[in-house]
């Protein structure tokens, strides 16, 4: 996204919308994960849109919080008040989910606030209006975000452990 300094990730999705056809995966660029997470997401039950979630004891202001109802996602956002999980920023779309997502992304970018929205705000909108967003837990598997320079040492160790596990397998 050449406009990353002026926009949020919804605009990046808009730029890539021509590639978002058929079945596809969408991953936040700052998310690191062990291979088993991708395997679990791909093997999840069929759904228009599937969001990977993790659960933990407490959540901070920067977490992308999620409210679930069984396997259904009811709400997602950093400021929602009721939540029971967090999104790790890794999603799977089927062809109909992809079409719905890109249509709403296009509509959102036509609004004044669209340039500053997260793409997960579109997922929240879809969950509220269409009830086609499901969740797949990756609880117990390792993942991390690369948000701050302080994250680098831990993330290097984590990635090295994944490589060692793969090489040793």
Question: What are the roles of these predicted feature ranges?
Answer:
Residues 1-24, 111, 167:
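Conserved N-terminal catalytic core of the sugar/cofactor nucleotidyltransferase
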Residues 14, 39, 124:
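Active-site phosphate/pyrophosphate- and oxyanion-stabilizing loops and adjacent acidic/basic residues
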Residues 20, 42, 71-74, 78, ...:
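ER/Golgi luminal nucleotide-sugar-dependent glycosyltransferases, focusing on the catalytic module
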Residues 34-113:
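Conserved core of the sugar-phosphate nucleotidyltransferase
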């Amino acid at each position: 996204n050449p406009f990353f300094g002026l926009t949020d990730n919804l605009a990046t999705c808009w730029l890539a919308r021509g590639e978002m056809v058929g079945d596809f995966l969408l991953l936040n660029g700052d998310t690191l994960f062990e291979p088993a997470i991708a395997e679990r997401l791909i093997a999840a039950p069929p759904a228009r849109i599937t969001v990977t979630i993790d659960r933990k004891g407490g959540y901070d202001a920067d977490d992308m919080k999620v409210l679930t109802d069984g396997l259904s996602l009811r709400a997602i956002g950093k400021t929602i008040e009721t939540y029971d999980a967090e999104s790790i920023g890794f999603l799977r779309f089927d062809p109909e989910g992809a079409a719905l997502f890109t249509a709403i992304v296009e509509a959102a970018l036509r609004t004044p606030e669209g340039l500053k929205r997260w793409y997960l705000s579109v997922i929240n909108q879809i969950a509220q209006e269409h009830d086609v967003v499901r969740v797949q837990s990756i609880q117990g598997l390792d993942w991390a975000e690369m948000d701050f320079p302080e994250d680098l040492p831990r993330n290097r160790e984590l990635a090295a452990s994944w490589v060692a596990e793969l090489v040793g397998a």
